[in-house]
Amino acid sequence: MKVLGISGSLRKDSHNTSLLRAAGELLPPGAELDLVGIGDLPLYDEDADTDPAPDAVARFRDAVASADAIVVSTPEYNASIPGPLKNAIDWASRPFEANPFRGKPVLVVGASTGLFGAVWAQAEIRKVLDHIGANVLDTELPVGQAHEAVAHGLRDAGISAELERQLAVLVAMTRDAEAVGHRSHRERERVAA
C-alpha cells in the first residue's frame, strides 16, 4: 500500500517533515510512505491551469492520484493553514471532476513549536479536504513543542503510540475503501439522497 506524505512546511529542517518520516517507520506491515515536495508548485492561477498542466503541478497531481492513502502534516502560521499547503491542495483539486483527493483516505497531523501543536491548522485543513471530497479521519494529533518532540526523531512515547494507532486506522480504512470502492462520506450522502 502506497501512503503519500505531504508536509505543509518548506523548511529544510521541518518538524512536520520529521513527523512524516517517523510516521513512515510506524506504518503497519505492507504499507510504505513516500514524501512529495510542494515547494516547486507555482501559486495557483486559473489562467495557468492549462492542459497540459505545468510540470510541477502534473507531478504533484500524479503523486496524489497514485497514492492509496495520504498523511498531511501541517505547521500552523497565524492560527491557520500555511500558504504552500493550501496552494498544493488548490492545484490538485482542480478541475473538480478530476480531483485525485476525492474519496482518498487522509490522516491530518501537525507539529508546531507552540504548546497547541497546530490544532487550528489541522481543523482548517480537515475542513478543506472534506470539502473537496477526501475521506478524512476525524482525529487530530497535535505535536506541541516540536523542536523538542520531533527535531531528532520522534522521542515522545505517547505521541508515537497515538501516531501508530492513527496510522493503523488509516491503513484499515484504506483497505476497507478499496474493498467497497473509494467514496467519501459526502459521495455516500449524495448517493443515498
Predicted regions and their residues:
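A generic structural motif
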Residues: 27-34, 134
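Helix-loop-strand module that forms the ligand-binding subsite of alpha/beta enzymes
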Residues: 52-132
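N-terminal beta-loop-helix "entrance" segment that forms/cooperates
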Residues: 38-54, 149-152
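Glycine-rich phosphate/pyrophosphate-binding loop and the adjoining helix
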Residues: 4, 135-193
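N-terminal beta1-alpha1 ligand-phosphate binding loop
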Residues: 1-30
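A general structural signal for well-ordered alpha-helical segments in protein cores
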Residues: 3, 16, 20, 57, ...
